[in-house]
Amino acid sequence: MARYVFITGGVVSSLGKGIASAALGALLQARGYRVRLRKLDPYLNVDPGTMSPYQHGEVFVTDDGAETDLDLGHYERFTGRSANKRDNITTGRIYQNIIEKERRGDYLGATVQVIPHVTDEIKQFVLEGNEEFDFVLCEIGGTVGDIEAMPFLEAIRQLGNELPRGNAVYIHLTLMPWIPAAGELKTKPTQHSVKELRSIGIAPDILLVRADRPVPPEERRKLSLFCNVRESAVIQALDVAHIYDVPMAYHKEGLDSEVLAAFGIDPAPKPRMERWEEVSNRIHNPEGEVTIAIVGKYTGLKDAYKSLNEALTHGGIANRVRVKLDWIESEIFEKEDPAPWLEKVHGILVPGGFGERGSEGKILAAKFARERKVPYFGICFGMQMACIEAARSLAGIEKASSTEFGPTKEPVVGLMTEWLRGNMLEKRTAAGDLGGTMRLGAYEARLQPGSKIAEIYGSEEISERHRHRYEVNIGYREKLEACGLVFAGLSPDGVLPETIEYPDHPWFVGVQYHPELKSRPFEPHPLFASFIAAAVEQSRLV
């Protein structure tokens, strides 16, 4: 039977519960255990798919097409296990399910209430489908005291009583701030956070204390005394240079040992940390450095491109180089010459995005990369803008544009209305709900034999994750290929362009999907490994 670890947060948000959960999952995996991670989000949105990147950060897409919290990306990258739609739930989804049941009459006329109906729905989500796992780690979004989180905290309190004795452990992540005027770390915020948690009925077994400097032994003893946890269970979570240092740091502090001790597992299997040691060594001891310009629309919030950032790091790990990122707002190129911004970089990446804002700047970035022979990687929107650039500059289609920006006589990029998923035909309309108009999840593609991208993958058949409404119009293939832009990858039915490339360019690749979502530190995605390798070659020329 699976054992459950519930991770809550206090004092302030953004302390890193997602990283802590992922790191603990990786440590338990390193000891040979089978681990599943789940995220419970208290917001009322059904999913984050329609939320602004500035509000929520990246939307992480799973193989089965779920739009989820970016923490699921951390879970996948740290553990190597692919998440699915059953690993993320929101208050909005919970209430949607309950209202549907109530309308069907499933509650047989009962008054539908937070307790027991909402809490029962949450508990069902936590418990279902865990038969093949040794540990299930559940991260509760938000902080203790948030009104939105109350049903989730009540549900995990109930689970602590309903599960067999010794099958649930509670970890509380808090902040221990340094007060310069006093010259000391303060325990009071953590004490009050634990007091709030205990008033709900949850007594934490382990305190994970975030701090920017070592926590003195006397302060640990103080937290142990006032928060009623063992002194060994007061674990400092110090700031580290890189997130892939976290598993090693937490292991050194004894987090995984304390969790296993709380479950009464003794003796515990010894962890194998060689892979994490190698990743850390490659990150901190690079043999070179390359600079990649990311020409995007949401560069003001780096979390909007979290998986992209990590995938580029993985590419650096594969090539033993440090990847320096130069974030550039694409609208700048609509006012200024791109050359001064781009002539010193070793690669240009144009990521996904939505809407017309900044699109002309991305087109100019693609043009610069094509003309100057700088490695270019266009992802989703970045591929579409590269095709529009080719249509305008090479094929003489001056009015080439996307129907996403408004009516156009030359729709090089247009709204998809139907496509195949396996043997099923899926249809969407522009008037449909935003959450239901996109091509989401893993789809197969066929790569052209002998193409650069087939060489990179080492295969002519691939499966990648998608998140887009618009697609390059296959009707322009002949004109664009006549200008040298090859449609090297298509959907299995040959209708949807999936990849493009210039054979006479050192490295110019566009993909309609999001390869960054499948990259892992131990298994860098081949496209990112190849892109960074091309940037290394470019660095020798600049």
UniProtKB/Swiss-Prot annotation:
Gene Ontology cellular-component annotations: cytosol
Active site feature: 380 (nucleophile), 514, 516
> What regulates the activity here?
Allosterically activated by GTP, when glutamine is the substrate; GTP has no effect on the reaction when ammonia is the substrate. The allosteric effector GTP functions by stabilizing the protein conformation that binds the tetrahedral intermediate(s) formed during glutamine hydrolysis. Inhibited by the product CTP, via allosteric rather than competitive inhibition.
Reactions the enzyme catalyzes: UTP + L-glutamine + ATP + H2O = CTP + L-glutamate + ADP + phosphate + 2 H(+); L-glutamine + H2O = L-glutamate + NH4(+); UTP + NH4(+) + ATP = CTP + ADP + phosphate + 2 H(+)
Q: Residues in domain Glutamine amidotransferase type-1?
A: 291-541
Residue segments, region Amidoligase domain = 1-265
Q: In which pathway does it act?
A: Pyrimidine metabolism; CTP biosynthesis via de novo pathway; CTP from UDP: step 2/2
Any GO BP: 'de novo' CTP biosynthetic process
Which molecular-function annotation in GO is an example for this chain? Answer: CTP synthase activity
Question: Which annotated residues bind UTP?
Answer: 13, 186-191, 222
Sequence positions that bind L-glutamine: 54, 353, 381-384, 404, 469
Q: What is its EC number?
A: 6.3.4.2
Q: Does the record's keyword annotation contain Transit peptide?
A: no
Annotated positions binding Mg(2+): 71, 139
UniProt keyword annotations, A-Z: ATP-binding, Glutamine amidotransferase, Ligase, Magnesium, Metal-binding, Nucleotide-binding, Pyrimidine biosynthesis
Query: Record's Gene3D superfamilies?
Result: 3.40.50.880, P-loop containing nucleotide triphosphate hydrolases
PANTHER family recorded: CTP SYNTHASE (PTHR11550), CTP SYNTHASE-RELATED (PTHR11550:SF0)
Misc remark: CTPSs have evolved a hybrid strategy for distinguishing between UTP and CTP. The overlapping regions of the product feedback inhibitory and substrate sites recognize a common feature in both compounds, the triphosphate moiety. To differentiate isosteric substrate and product pyrimidine rings, an additional pocket far from the expected kinase/ligase catalytic site, specifically recognizes the cytosine and ribose portions of the product inhibitor.
- Free-text function comment from the UniProt entry: Catalyzes the ATP-dependent amination of UTP to CTP with either L-glutamine or ammonia as the source of nitrogen. Regulates intracellular CTP levels through interactions with the four ribonucleotide triphosphates.
Oligomeric state and interaction partners are given as: Homotetramer.
The family assignment reads:
Belongs to the CTP synthase family.
Q: What is the protein's given name?
A: CTP synthase
